[in-house]
Swiss-Prot record:
Primary localisation category: cytoplasm
Source species taxonomy: Bacteria, Bacillati, Bacillota, Bacilli, Bacillales
Keyword field: Cytoplasm, Metal-binding, Zinc
Requisite cofactors: Zn(2+)
Species annotation: Bacillus cereus (strain ATCC 10987 / NRS 248)
Annotated protein name in UniProt: Protein SprT-like
Length: 152
């Protein structure tokens, strides 16, 4: 799906579900990571995440488009366009748009785990962040800490 196809899709969804035309640009933004799409208040454009289309298909993309068009049409008409606004929630229900998009699969970062051991009492510490072993000591016996395992 290219830029012209997504523009046409957004215009069709706008007329079909909202009965109002979409007069601005709809485009894919490759820099979007965790969100399905976003409505830009200053330009009135809609940016969509292409990876959601690749992963979940056109149905999920149409749901994201409907969600962003709710923001668009409410903002254009001067009504409450934010997620917490009553107008927004009512319009979402009326057009059967999702409040949130699905989570991206395989997007979880592998969590690094650092394991430290006290040289004095052999107490082990598991941390997600690396610590400076020259500055910190064991809380139990004040012994020196050494890094024994780094898992990524």
């Amino acid at each position: 799906m290219d830029e012209q196809e997504i523009q046409r899709l957004v215009e069709e969804v706008s007329l079909q579900y909202f009965g109002m035309p979409f007069l601005h640009k709809a485009l894919f933004n490759s820099r979007l990571r965790t969100t399905g799409g976003r409505y830009l208040l200053n330009t009135h454009n809609i940016e969509l995440n292409y990876r959601y289309y690749e992963m979940y298909g056109k149905e999920e993309l149409v749901g994201i488009v409907k969600h962003e068009l709710c923001h668009y049409h409410l903002h254009i008409t001067g009504r409450g366009y934010k997620h917490r606004d009553k107008d927004f929630r009512e319009l979402l229900k009326a057009v059967d748009a999702p409040r949130f998009c699905k989570r991206m699969m395989n997007e979880e970062k592998e969590k690094k785990v650092y394991m430290y051991e006290c040289m004095g009492c052999s107490l082990q510490y598991v941390r997600r962040r690396q610590i400076n072993t020259k500055r910190y000591v064991c809380g139990k016996c004040k012994g020196k800490l050494i890094l024994i395992k780094k898992t990524s």
